[in-house]
Amino acid sequence: MLLAIDIGNTHTVIGVYAGDSLRAMWRIATNRKAAADELRIVFSTLFSLEGLDLRQVRASAVASVVPQLTRAWMQAIEDATGTLSLVCNAETAAGLFDADYPNPREIGADRVADAVAARALYGAPVVVVDFGTATNIEVIDRDGRFRGGVIAPGVQTSANALFTHGAQLPDIALVAPPAVIGTNTVEAIQSGIMLGEADRVDGLVRRIFDQLGYSAKVIATGGLAAVVERYSSTIDEVNTELTLEGLRLIADRAYR
């Protein structure tokens, strides 16, 4: 089995693959202060609850945007499974990831994994919208090259900023209201955050198409992808496993 871990600023997603089949997936809060022993207990417990055996893990891959946690996760994985983790980046993804980009080393691991999976699953050109702490848009051109993209504050990040600085604004559920014109404070905030996010993505995607000179399939991933997709006119498909799938493909090639 392959253990794939996507360490984000807010959430960490853990996936277990048997061949190319995803056997289990968990989404947990990212704890920046967690030590290796704590992390080992976390995923050992998850494996046990799912009836999976850690001793069957033969390889592992990590995509991390939290540098201080990368080593802790790698140590936890090694202690629990005896495997040394492949760390995802533009170099370790070579052969699957071709970048027309001034400095490929600065491309985040999650963006690399998303681009690898999108190109493999959907062909080129393709655009990925990843809804996380940041909303990332990745552009793969018709030649299959990663061209760059957009990084913007994520839905929850924007909402937190609004609630923090607006003393009289209530904390709300991140769902769209029944209509764009809110008839109370909660609906008005939901309209601004959720419908505003969908329109922001649509506007940016159209600008990307204009710059490329052609359109592309648009794939959404991340925690709020399914919610935003309902109100977007440019998103074609939601694939919540995209980042993990990219890690699997990169690891499969590396361990071949």
Describe the function of each predicted region.
Residues 2-4, 30, 158-256:
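ATP-binding/phosphotransfer module of carbohydrate and carboxylate kinases, centering on a glycine-rich
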Residues 2-6, 61, 126-130, 219:
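Short glycine-aspartate micro-motif
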Residues 2-48, 55, 145-171, 175-176:
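Short glycine-rich, Thr/Ser-proximal phosphate-binding strand/loop in the N-terminal lobe
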Residues 12-16, 135-140:
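Short beta-strand scaffold segments in enzyme catalytic cores
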Residues 33-34, 92-96, 242-246:
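A short acidic, often aromatic-flanked loop/helix-cap motif at beta-alpha or helix-coil junctions
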Residues 50-107, 143-149, 154-155, 183-194, ...:
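Short beta-strand-loop/turn "lid" adjacent to the catalytic site in phosphate-handling enzymes
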Residues 93-126, 248-256:
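Conserved phosphate-binding catalytic cores of ATP/NTP-utilizing and phosphoryl-transfer enzymes
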